[in-house]
Amino acid sequence: MVHFHPFGNVNFYEMDWSLKGDLWAHDPVIAKEGSRWYVFHTGSGIQIKTSEDGVHWENMGRVFPSLPDWCKQYVPEKDEDHLWAPDICFYNGIYYLYYSVSTFGKNTSVIGLATNRTLDPRDPDYEWKDMGPVIHSTASDNYNAIDPNVVFDQEGQPWLSFGSFWSGIQLIQLDTETMKPAAQAELLTIASRGEEPNAIEAPFIVCRNGYYYLFVSFDFCCRGIESTYKIAVGRSKDITGPYVDKNGVSMMQGGGTILDAGNDRWIGPGHCAVYFSGVSAILVNHAYDALKNGEPTLQIRPLYWDDEGWPYL
């Protein structure tokens, strides 16, 4: 049985998303278990936040107390415990948390996996289990194994999308037992800007009304108020593509309809995730707050869909 993100009967469109509390976050994803909400984001050991209502957030510690031992095998230069860009899904009674180990600007990288039976630290079953590496890249590869996102296709088959710069966004089929790449699975490139420096990363795929929507981030994060990050989207009838934007331009040729490029206060929105509860949807991302010297800040906003099935804010 597959549960993507069990948000229960919450109607996202009826909520007031004026977030409060501990909102420092980079590359956030969300899950909900019972009545409690959780955010996982980039930081020491993967940072966790929690909320009783999805609006008021507080820090709740970390997934890993230190860098998992095996990481140095794949990323020898990694000398701190800063883990990047997690993604979480719930499948067959287990939470699967994917995350990235890398150093800035290099593609010597690895995606790791941790599992847990619950997200509630008060539960006696609460324990993050290190499941080791999922897929890695080296300097000789033309892709970068960071920014994981797991998506289940309409037949319930899990896939992993990932990628940052280099040749762009990748997709590979997962084994349903291990939730790691299936034997002989082919690595597919599904989106690329088509020109250097190929500033595309952070894929997130969702399925809605027979279309797969590929959300990505264009341009540059991590520069505070100088960031140029923006969220773009395309869609396909097939999970493997071809993904095209609103104008029919292939995402393999630089296509991507801009969903959000920020404003004077919220600069460089990106690294987004999209969740559904019934017919309602939210967009989760970080943006750099110009009023706080460019601090990366959690954003959750209702995401709407036009008559042609394209998302808008």
Swiss-Prot record:
Subcellular location: Cytoplasm
Residues at the site labelled Important for substrate recognition: 271
Pathway the protein takes part in: Glycan metabolism; L-arabinan degradation
A Pfam family of this chain: Glyco_hydro_43
Gene Ontology, cellular component aspect: cytoplasm
Sites marked Important for catalytic activity, responsible for pKa modulation of the active site Glu and correct orientation of both the proton donor and substrate: 147
Location of the active site: 27 (proton acceptor), 201 (proton donor)
Binding-site positions, Ca(2+): 271
GO MF assignments: arabinan endo-1,5-alpha-L-arabinosidase activity; metal ion binding
Role description: Involved in the degradation of arabinan and is a key enzyme in the complete degradation of the plant cell wall. Catalyzes the cleavage of endo alpha-(1->5)-L-arabinofuranosyl residues in debranched arabinan.
Protein name: Intracellular endo-alpha-(1->5)-L-arabinanase
Origin species: Geobacillus thermodenitrificans
